[in-house]
Every structure is written in structure tokens, then in C-alpha cells.
């Protein structure tokens, strides 16, 4: 693996931003030396260098909250790295999902973030099936009931659009999306599977490859 483009600082370190590949949420800011970066690329597991312990730090080594690394990005100056990960549990030692859980300025959440969080909640409900949970109730009712609900919600979306009612359309479309996410989770698919398919269909094409995106 060629790390010649990485500009480590005078202590042999480079800052690493850890980002949830599903939601885009920033999880952690840590540091890596050459060995940690090499191990991350080799194992596809987040590995850092602890400045306090002066040793490699493998995320989840003691907590079990590992991070599968799906992509490693280097910034334009070569002096910062991004790990895009699929986290298995919270990133923060406090038990919070992200180390950046204290807002100084609260902002709007984008669609990718919200979809990722809703899907994660659905998966957790399907795993634990808590009493009183709508997801658990629909799961027990069976796939046919979920699919019937999708049909009902799709009809509501059509009616809202037909009536040119943006507010109603917004709510009905959200209901439809929720039940689509529930269906994906029931069948073992993820929003990333949809994103991959959409990207394959619509990504910019080279003028030399003989094909064109939609």
C-alpha cells in the first residue's frame, strides 16, 4: 500500500475524521501513525494511535464496538484522513453514538442522516421486539401486512399529490418511506444497497465508455 501522499506531522501522526458511511455523521476525531493507517487498510477495521498511551488503539478491542472501514479518503493537502465506517455500536466512550453529541449550534438534519437513524432504530426494534413497539407489532403481523401498508401509504401519496397538497404529501411520503425502510430491514437490505443501485444507474459516465447515465 502506497502512503507516500500522506503528510504525517513532526510526531509522525495524521488526524483522522471517522464518519458513519450510512448517515454521513461525524463520529470521532482521532490520530493515526503510519502503522495504524497500514493496519486499517489491511484489516478494514478502525485503528488509531493513542497519544496518551503512545500505542496503537484498535476501536472496539475492549468494548466490542468495532468499526468496519469501507473507505479511506485523503484530503487535498494530504495532511488529514477520513475513515468512512459501518459502526457496530456507539463510537464514544460515554456510550453516545458519536463523540460530537454536545451541540453548540443545532442545525437541520439532512435526508441521508435521518434515513440512516430511522433505519438503525428499525433494526434495533426488530432485534429486541420491545412490547408496545409499532415495528415489533408489524413484524409479528407478517410481511404481507407490511406490504399492504405500503400499498395504503402509496395510495395516500397519490391522493395528496393529485390534490396538490404539499403539506399532506410531505407527511404521507414520510409514512411511505418509513414502511419501505421497514420492508428493506425485514428482507436484509439496507439504504446503502439502494444508494449503490441508484449510483450505478445515475453516476456520471465517461464519454469514452459508450454508455450514458439517466
Curated annotation (Swiss-Prot):
CDD domains assigned to the protein according to its UniProt record, in alphabetical order: NTP-PPase_HisIE_like
Reactions mediated catalytically: 1-(5-phospho-beta-D-ribosyl)-ATP + H2O = 1-(5-phospho-beta-D-ribosyl)-5'-AMP + diphosphate + H(+); 1-(5-phospho-beta-D-ribosyl)-5'-AMP + H2O = 1-(5-phospho-beta-D-ribosyl)-5-[(5-phospho-beta-D-ribosylamino)methylideneamino]imidazole-4-carboxamide
GO cellular component assignments: cytoplasm
UniProt-recorded Gene Ontology molecular function terms: ATP binding; phosphoribosyl-AMP cyclohydrolase activity; phosphoribosyl-ATP diphosphatase activity
Pfam hit, one: PRA-PH
Pathway: Amino-acid biosynthesis; L-histidine biosynthesis; L-histidine from 5-phospho-alpha-D-ribose 1-diphosphate: step 2/9; Amino-acid biosynthesis; L-histidine biosynthesis; L-histidine from 5-phospho-alpha-D-ribose 1-diphosphate: step 3/9
Coiled-coil spans in chain: none
Subcellular location, principal: cytoplasm
Entry's EC annotation: 3.5.4.19, 3.6.1.31
Location within or outside the cell: Cytoplasm
Keyword Cytoplasm in record: yes
Region of interest: Phosphoribosyl-ATP pyrophosphohydrolase: 115-214
Gene Ontology annotations of biological process type: L-histidine biosynthetic process
Region Phosphoribosyl-AMP cyclohydrolase, annotated ranges: 1-114
Superkingdom as given in the UniProt entry: Bacteria
InterPro entries: His_synth_HisIE (IPR023019), HisE (IPR008179), PRA-CH (IPR026660), PRib-ATP_PPHydrolase-like (IPR021130), PRib_AMP_CycHydrolase_dom (IPR002496), PRib_AMP_CycHydrolase_sf (IPR038019)
Keyword ATP-binding in annotation: yes
Keyword terms: Amino-acid biosynthesis, ATP-binding, Cytoplasm, Histidine biosynthesis, Hydrolase, Multifunctional enzyme, Nucleotide-binding
Family: In the N-terminal section; belongs to the PRA-CH family.
Designated name of the protein: Histidine biosynthesis bifunctional protein HisIE
Species annotation: Thermus thermophilus (strain ATCC BAA-163 / DSM 7039 / HB27)
Taxonomic lineage: Bacteria, Thermotogati, Deinococcota, Deinococci, Thermales
Gene from which this protein is expressed: hisI
Amino acid at each position: 500500500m502506497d502512503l507516500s501522499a500522506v503528510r504525517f506531522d513532526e510526531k509522525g501522526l495524521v488526524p483522522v475524521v471517522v464518519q458513519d458511511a450510512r448517515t454521513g455523521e461525524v463520529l470521532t476525531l482521532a490520530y493515526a501513525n503510519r502503522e495504524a493507517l497500514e493496519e486499517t487498510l489491511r484489516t478494514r477495521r478502525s485503528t488509531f494511535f493513542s497519544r496518551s498511551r503512545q500505542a496503537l488503539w484498535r476501536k472496539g478491542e475492549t468494548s466490542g464496538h468495532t468499526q468496519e472501514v469501507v473507505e479511506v479518503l485523503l484530503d487535498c493537502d494530504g495532511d488529514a484522513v477520513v475513515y468512512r465506517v459501518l459502526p457496530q455500536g456507539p463510537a464514544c466512550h460515554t456510550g453516545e453514538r458519536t463523540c460530537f453529541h454536545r451541540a453548540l449550534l443545532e442545525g437541520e438534519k439532512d435526508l441521508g442522516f435521518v434515513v440512516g437513524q430511522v433505519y438503525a432504530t428499525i433494526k434495533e426494534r426488530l432485534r429486541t421486539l420491545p412490547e408496545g413497539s409499532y415495528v415489533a407489532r408489524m413484524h409479528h403481523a407478517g410481511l404481507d401486512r407490511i406490504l399492504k401498508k405500503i400499498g395504503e401509504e402509496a395510495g395516500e401519496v397519490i391522493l395528496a399529490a393529485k390534490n396538490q397538497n404539499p403539506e399532506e404529501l410531505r407527511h404521507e411520503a414520510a409514512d411511505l418511506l418509513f414502511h419501505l425502510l421497514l420492508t428493506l430491514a425485514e428482507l436484509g437490505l439496507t439504504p446503502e444497497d439502494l444508494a449503490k443501485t441508484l449510483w450505478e444507474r445515475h453516476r456520471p459516465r465517461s464519454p469514452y465508455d459508450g454508455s450514458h447515465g439517466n
